[in-house]
Amino acid sequence: MTKQLTIALTKGRIEKDTVKLLERAGFDMSFMADKGRNLIFESPDKSFRFLLVKAPDVTTYVRHGVADIGVVGKDVLIEHPTGYLEMLDLNFGLCKFSVASTPDYNPSDHKRKRIATKYPTVARDFFNQKGEDVEIISIQGSVEIAPVIGLADAIVDIVETGNTLVANGLEVFEDICRISARMIVNKASLKNKPELLAFIKKMENLVGDREVAFK
């Protein structure tokens, strides 16, 4: 008997791109078209169940075996690095981690900098690799105002188009790393569900063609 696969993903852009990818793989995803306020969806043939959750919670659902598969940005995985297997770079949801600040910021200044961010692990690791001792200020909301009001010398944040930075008088000084959506899986599920391995191989063949993945 075929076992159902549960997939946890973030509502919004990643969800939409994941649905498109599954459609290209030949799966009927029409049941996801009219979601309303629902957060749990099951395919008509019962082969898939989808959970729409907040991005940081995707790893939690996969880690505890509630979901067999998770689709989430690499930014989340860097901050929550354990308890799952990272299987595939899905080649969508592309953006980057960058250091940004007001135009008078000097990245070569060796004074102890204050860095505001929602991603303390990313920021700390980046500056440690540069041999710089920095003070990390964790902020949960919009970080763009931190350099403007003097709370921090610079910020580490996700940059896609850069429009939000420009609108707040900031510019990018350093790029840290590329970010994209990744597929993660539960370790026990990979061992106990042959359907999961077959699904991963199917996705791997599809995302290997970047033109197909981005079309």
Curated annotation (Swiss-Prot):
InterPro entries, A to Z = ATP_PRibTrfase_cat (IPR013820), ATP_PRibTrfase_CS (IPR018198), ATP_PRibTrfase_HisG (IPR001348), ATP_PRibTrfase_HisG_short (IPR024893)
| Superkingdom assignment | Bacteria
Q: In which pathway does it act?
A: Amino-acid biosynthesis; L-histidine biosynthesis; L-histidine from 5-phospho-alpha-D-ribose 1-diphosphate: step 1/9
* Documented EC number(s): 2.4.2.17
A single GO molecular function, which one?
A: ATP phosphoribosyltransferase activity
Top EC class, one word: transferase
Q: Could you tell me what reaction this enzyme catalyses?
A: 1-(5-phospho-beta-D-ribosyl)-ATP + diphosphate = 5-phospho-alpha-D-ribose 1-diphosphate + ATP
Question: What PROSITE patterns does this protein's entry cite?
Answer: ATP_P_PHORIBOSYLTR (PS01316)
**Subcellular location field:** Cytoplasm
A GO biological-process term? L-histidine biosynthetic process
Record's Gene3D superfamilies?
Periplasmic binding protein-like II
Q: Which UniProt keywords apply?
A: Amino-acid biosynthesis, ATP-binding, Cytoplasm, Glycosyltransferase, Histidine biosynthesis, Nucleotide-binding, Transferase
* Predominant localisation class: cytoplasm
Any one cellular-component term (Gene Ontology): cytoplasm
Oligomer and partners? Heteromultimer composed of HisG and HisZ subunits.
Role description: Catalyzes the condensation of ATP and 5-phosphoribose 1-diphosphate to form N'-(5'-phosphoribosyl)-ATP (PR-ATP). Has a crucial role in the pathway because the rate of histidine biosynthesis seems to be controlled primarily by regulation of HisG enzymatic activity.
Q: Domain comment text?
A: Lacks the C-terminal regulatory region which is replaced by HisZ.
**The protein's name in its UniProt record:** ATP phosphoribosyltransferase
Q: Which organism is it from?
A: Streptococcus mutans serotype c (strain ATCC 700610 / UA159)
Provide the organism lineage as a comma list. Bacteria, Bacillati, Bacillota, Bacilli, Lactobacillales
